[in-house]
Amino acid sequence: MLCRSFNISQLAIPFVSVLISFLAYTSQLFFYYFEEAPLRSEEFWRLNIFAVCIWVCYYRACTVDPGRIPKDWTPPNLKQLEKDCAGGRQRWCRRCEAFKPPRAHHCKTCQRCIPKMDHHCPWTSNCVSHFTYPHFMRFLFYAVVGMGYLETLLFERASIVWASRHLPSYLGPGLGQLVHLFILLVVNSLTWLALFILLLRSIWSLALNTTTIESWEIERHETLLRRARHFGGYLSGPGGIQIRIKKQEFPYDIGIWSNIRAGMGGSANVLSWFWPFAATPDRSTGLEFEVNGFEDPNLSWPPPDPDRIPLPAKREDMSAAIAAADASYHRALQARNIQRSNDASHSGGHPIQRRKRFHDRFNENKAKERLSESESDFSDDEEVQDGEEGWKNSEGDRLRDFGVDEEAEFYDEEDIPLGILMQRRRQQ
């Protein structure tokens, strides 16, 4: 039973804790016995202050709740939501059975929608979100600065060893000390380099006010624009519908200063950005965000994606005249739609139809295969697990690499009318 419930990701936090302890404390043990250059008092205090800051920030990045969407939250503009749904901008999570605020995504690990989700970090076993992002940034900062300082101390001792390499061995450190120094240098250097690159990338994203997922969405949008140019500005969606693809500016880049302030909890106090015990952002925030006004404020992000539009709803085989005359038919149909939607969401329902990759569909259409367009757009091969949701950016990442539930982001059983979604929400 224990083996079945074990997941290797459960070792992430213990591994990081052991790594921090190894670098922070066994290094001091090495310095203590290194007679050629023992640890000075000011070096001792700096090392331990950095270690405390790293521990505090890492603990908070691991334990602070990444946030939840209030059960009673609904979009402020329902009329605009109707237009968004019609244009492929539906913000309804079929996993949570709730509306998704801007910048929220469904995390497959946390199993809920996360406000302003950046990614699910395996090393903290927690989502980096609107509420945990400041703690995550401070952890990266103090880890890079602390290990950078440790690197200078290790390099100083390594230089002493190298300078005395021609002296008799009994005049220098023992074999155990040399091995310890070598391991410390290698582990600290590699870890520092990896975290330094991650910190630079995170600072860049912070300055632009883009999450990791949104950077992926921006690159995806640019890819769709290139595809659409080949087809006169349009791409085909499910059922053969034509979707207009036009360039849309990222709406949340509001200036470097405002971007950094918003990402670090909303405070304009620069010192609080570096304070390990700084307060978590107010829990009432994270549902609405300031926009730059470059686009129509009613346009949502991400832009329309033909491969993220729900399948067109199936029509009942009954004439419009009979349907209009029979009110009970409408009530029964609505109840049946709600029940079918609930069954599909909670018990698996109908299997998800995955759209084939764009290039596969393009080649099939070009070759004029005998299948109809609606049939050839979707794959029935259960062994083909990667449809268009398997699209990767230039770095080889797809949405699931950031912890996002791809099925919840890309597919739905059918295009459920907004009225039915609202009624289903009230019945919960």
UniProtKB/Swiss-Prot annotation:
EC number: 2.3.1.225
Superkingdom to which the source organism belongs: Eukaryota
MF terms (GO), sorted A to Z: protein-cysteine S-palmitoyltransferase activity
Gene Ontology CC: endoplasmic reticulum; endoplasmic reticulum membrane; Golgi apparatus
Active-site annotation: 121
Compositionally biased intervals (Basic and acidic residues): 360-373, 389-400
Chain ranges on the Cytoplasmic side, renumbered to this chain: 1-10, 62-134, 199-428
Job of this protein: Mediates the reversible addition of palmitate to target proteins, thereby regulating their membrane association and biological function.
Protein name as catalogued: Palmitoyltransferase pfa4
Naturally occurring in which organism (per UniProt): Aspergillus fumigatus (strain ATCC MYA-4609 / CBS 101355 / FGSC A1100 / Af293) (Neosartorya fumigata)
